[in-house]
UniProtKB/Swiss-Prot annotation:
The lineage of its organism: Eukaryota, Metazoa, Chordata, Craniata, Vertebrata. Monomer and homodimer. Interacts with ITGA2B (via C-terminus cytoplasmic tail region); the interaction is stabilized/increased in a calcium and magnesium-dependent manner. Interacts with TMC1. Ca(2+) 1 binds at residues 116, 118, 120, 122, 127. This is Calcium and integrin-binding family member 3. One of its GO terms (molecular function) is magnesium ion binding. Transmembrane segments: none annotated. Acts a an auxiliary subunit of the sensory mechanoelectrical transduction (MET) channel in hair cells. Plays a role in regulating hair cell MET channel localization and function. Keywords: Calcium, Magnesium, Metal-binding, Repeat. The keyword Magnesium applies. PANTHER family: CALCIUM AND INTEGRIN BINDING FAMILY MEMBER 2 (PTHR45791), CALCIUM AND INTEGRIN-BINDING FAMILY MEMBER 3 (PTHR45791:SF7). GO terms for biological process: calcium ion homeostasis. The binding of either calcium or magnesium significantly increases the structural stability of the protein in comparison to apo-CIB (calcium- and magnesium-free form). It comes from Homo sapiens. Pfam families: EF-hand_7 (PF13499).
Length: 187
């Protein structure tokens, strides 16, 4: 009795529940996953809101991400500085957006950010080339990649400006019934 370690205050747990799609139990499970990545760095007591970031090298090596060709972009998009190093809040946000409970429009927004490699708020031909190359793990020739990108732009570029806006991307995602089932990470 009395030996129970307090990881979060009641208010912290409520706040995490309010801004994620997780239960208290899932939040605790994710905290321990985060802590296990860097036990020497991440304290078991978060009641004082420590300023801790787990390096990308550890985030990218997690079983949920290590085989994903977009692991670096995912980490960059969810990290506050864009460097892939994650605070606990970033880590919970990433898992929340990638959870099965997250709505399609939220997933589409983050997928768009992940595929926008040059961070200009559009997916241009270069961004598409990076995306196709990662998806095929370099298995297509430059000509084949270019052809795929051209077809995507022909199909999805609603205003014909040679790039995809978030709205263009969301309209394209609406026509992809398997998007929700593929854009997730199980916890």
């Amino acid at each position: 009795m009395g030996n129970k370690q307090t990881v979060f205050t009641h208010e912290q747990l409520e706040a995490y529940q309010d801004c994620t799609f997780f239960t208290r139990k899932e939040i605790m499970r994710l905290f321990y996953r985060y802590q296990d990545l860097a036990p020497q760095l991440v304290p078991l007591d978060y009641t004082t809101c420590p300023d801790v970031k787990v390096p990308y090298e550890l985030i990218g090596s997690m079983p949920e991400l290590k085989d994903n060709p977009f692991r670096q972009r995912i980490a960059q998009v969810f990290s506050e500085d864009g460097d892939g190093h994650m605070t606990l809040d970033n880590f919970l946000d990433m898992f929340s957006v990638m959870s099965e409970m997250a709505p399609r429009d939220l997933k589409a927004y983050y997928a768009f950010k992940i595929y926008d490699f040059n961070n200009d708020d559009y997916i241009c031909a270069w961004d598409l080339e990076q995306t196709v190359t990662k998806l095929t793990r370099g298995g297509l020739s430059a000509e084949e990649v270019s052809l795929v990108c051209e077809k995507v732009l022909d199909e999805a570029d609603g205003d014909h400006d040679g790039r995809l806006s978030l709205e263009d991307f969301q309209n394209m995602i609406l026509r992809a019934p398997d998007f929700l089932s593929t854009f997730h990470i199980r916890i």
